[in-house]
């Protein structure tokens, strides 16, 4: 059954009105606007609409603004929105400003926003300025002049320096510098007993070096938590050096032995070479004698005299060899 247009028109208008109201309440955070008015914060409807158009969540701006207004801070909507669009944490910055205000720490919004955009936790920095933080260093090994190793563990009490949070070094630098100072201080000690008797000497020496320069912290104190005696590094190094010297000496002795063996073989070869030359020279003697006899330079009697001399020499050699062999076979008891 078809309803008359006079009956349908009010229903259509009511539906359109409900849709329009729902769209308005969805696009315009009326509840947030009412909360701001109740808190005494002047935020216009069109300001909230502009936030929607700029893809800014109004609650991320209005709630911190209400908090800052109640804390007595002079912060504008434009400042908070600009920091939000830059990728900052608006709520954390406002909390840091409130904490700094309560602790009487001078901190402006621009400075807090810069610290937050630099990746630092500005709220933690303010809290650390009020309540210093204790940093425990890992075990640091150092060797005194007498060669004894000491293993030291220290506690460093630091306070955040808000003025140096942007661009200042972090905790890792503090730990590295303290470890370096401990190694230097122990290394300059004559013996490890002095360090064990007076460990605060190390902490005073390290603290006097100004290790917090260029960092985001101010070192309040350095306390030696634990000192343990380690290895005798000096004796170990001496042992290693002696072993190395021994190996070097053995290598040099082996080199000299090899050179002596090579020299011996060289001399044997040289003797064989000389013997070959003697044999070669002896083979020329008969030819020379024949030449001398033929040319009349050597007489027959001279030749026989030389033969007698050679026979006597050979006989003496045989007698000498026989005497030596008898002596070797019958040694004296």
From Swiss-Prot:
Sorted UniProt keywords: Cell membrane, Membrane, Transmembrane, Transmembrane helix
Gene Ontology CC: one annotated term: plasma membrane
Keyword Nucleotide-binding attached: no
Membrane-spanning segments: 8-28, 30-50
One Pfam family linked to the record: FloA
Subcellular location: Cell membrane; Membrane raft
Principal subcellular localisation of the protein: membrane
Membrane topology of this protein: Multi-pass membrane protein
NCBIfam families reported in the protein's UniProt record: PRK13665.1
Subunit structure: Homooligomerizes.
Biological role: Found in functional membrane microdomains (FMM) that may be equivalent to eukaryotic membrane rafts. FMMs are highly dynamic and increase in number as cells age. Flotillins are thought to be important factors in membrane fluidity.
Family statement: Belongs to the flotillin-like FloA family.
Protein known as: Flotillin-like protein FloA
The organism's taxonomic lineage, starting at the top: Bacteria, Bacillati, Bacillota, Clostridia, Eubacteriales
